[in-house]
């Protein structure tokens, strides 16, 4: 593979943020400048709270800017499974909150969002039956969900879902919070963090509280979360624009292990096959591998019927929780954490960003409890 490990979303028009240079003082230090961290920073600024945000690389350099660009309602588990695992009240509350959040994202960054819905396509007869169970459960609760049987396969159409450019959205948010008074620093990896202090090689941030808003490698940064959180490598590729196939909306297949969409310019982007590569994909390494990339390309050629050349190959780290619900709560004295979105951080992560601010500043547990149940405040 000779292609650079760069996502299709990157238009090369971003000027990297500076690194921290010396000690600074602030009210809250947010570690992680992805979608959830930037949402937390927005919320802090709205409350008049001084804030410094840092990232080991740059804005949305991790999964926040390197994912498939899906805005999906609901929890990690399909709705009927979420009802079984977490109870109907929580499953419904999460679904309603994510529907509202998708609209909020569209209103805040309309140039990055396309309200086109999404398709869940079954790979087996067993999955067709599972789709029918999901349809029954959702319709029984008055949620939008339509049966689909057409050109792209058999499954479900979700009208409330959307497509977006995740990197463009995060860069827009970063630009806004900078203009609103936040201080943001890139290339500033954390060496140590504790109550009142975040240390890096370039200086120390003295603060009243720390919010860790990291998804992939959360278990590396906060080792106490190991056993509840595990980081995986998610790989993707994109093709040149093509008219060989028209994909009307974000589509996920084989219970979500494969996922693809067609961008406005006609290019096709696809990710998946993490499970087929076995234990090797439970790793902190974000280098694309020949094995998974070959499976992705074969799927594009054989299943989707697209022969357009591959233009991008990339990977990112994403953390998965043992419950399917995110990490959200106090993890050390003066330190709160959000992350481990299990591949669904585009929407859930934004909700967690606001919920953790309410938790850390006010001790208000209600927004967090809606998402994860009992929390440590």
Give, region by region, the residue ranges found by the protein language model.
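Flavin (FAD/FMN) cofactor-binding and adjacent substrate-gating region
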Residues: 1-10, 77-83, 103-175, 179-180, ...
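Extreme N-terminal leader/targeting segments of oxidoreductases
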Residues: 1-28
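N-terminal Rossmann-like FAD-binding beta1-loop-alpha1 element of flavoenzymes
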Residues: 24-53
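Glycine-rich FAD pyrophosphate-binding loop
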Residues: 46-66
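Central beta-strand plus flanking loop segment that forms part of the substrate or channel wall
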Residues: 68-71, 75-76, 80, 116-121, ...
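C-terminal catalytic lobe of FAD-dependent flavoproteins
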Residues: 160, 298-377
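Flavin-dependent oxidoreductases
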Residues: 193-268
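Active-site lid/adjacent beta-loop-alpha segment flanking the redox-cofactor pocket in flavoenzymes
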Residues: 243-331
């Amino acid at each position: 593979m000779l292609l650079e490990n760069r996502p299709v979303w990157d238009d090369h028009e971003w000027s990297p943020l500076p690194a921290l240079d010396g000690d600074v003082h602030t009210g809250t230090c947010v570690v992680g400048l992805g979608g959830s961290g930037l949402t937390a920073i927005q919320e802090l600024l709205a409350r008049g709270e001084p804030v410094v945000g840092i990232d080991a690389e740059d804005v949305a350099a991790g999964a926040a800017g390197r994912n498939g660009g899906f805005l999906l309602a609901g929890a990690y588990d399909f709705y009927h499974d979420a009802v079984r695992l977490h109870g109907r009240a929580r499953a419904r509350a999460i679904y309603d909150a994510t529907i509202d959040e998708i609209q909020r994202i569209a209103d805040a960054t309309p140039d990055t969002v396309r309200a086109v819905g999404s398709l869940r396509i079954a790979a087996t007869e067993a999955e067709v039956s599972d789709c029918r169970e999901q349809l029954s459960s959702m319709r029984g609760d008055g949620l939008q969900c339509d049966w689909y049987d057409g050109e792209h396969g058999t499954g479900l159409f979700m009208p409330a879902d959307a497509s977006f450019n995740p990197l463009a959205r995060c860069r827009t948010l970063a630009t806004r919070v900078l203009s609103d008074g936040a201080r943001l620093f890139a290339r500033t990896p954390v060496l140590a963090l504790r109550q009142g202090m975040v240390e890096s090689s370039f200086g120390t941030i003295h603060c009243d509280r720390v919010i860790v808003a990291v998804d992939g490698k959360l278990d590396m940064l906060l080792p106490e979360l190991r056993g509840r959180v595990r980081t995986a490598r998610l790989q993707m590729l994109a093709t040149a624009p093509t008219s060989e196939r028209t994909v009307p909306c974000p589509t996920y297949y084989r219970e979500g292990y494969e996922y693809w969409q067609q961008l406005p310019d006609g290019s096709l982007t696809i990710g998946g096959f993490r499970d087929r590569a076995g234990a090797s994909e439970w790793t902190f390494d974000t280098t694309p591998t020949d094995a998974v990339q070959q499976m992705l390309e074969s799927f594009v050629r054989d299943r989707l019927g697209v022969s357009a050349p591959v233009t991008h190959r990339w990977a990112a780290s994403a953390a998965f929780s043992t419950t399917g619900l995110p990490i959200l709560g106090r993890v050390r004295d003066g330190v709160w954490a959000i992350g481990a979105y299990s591949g669904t951080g585009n929407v859930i992560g934004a909700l967690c960003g606001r919920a953790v601010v309410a938790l850390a500043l006010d001790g208000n547990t209600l927004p967090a409890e809606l998402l994860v149940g009992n929390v440590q405040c």
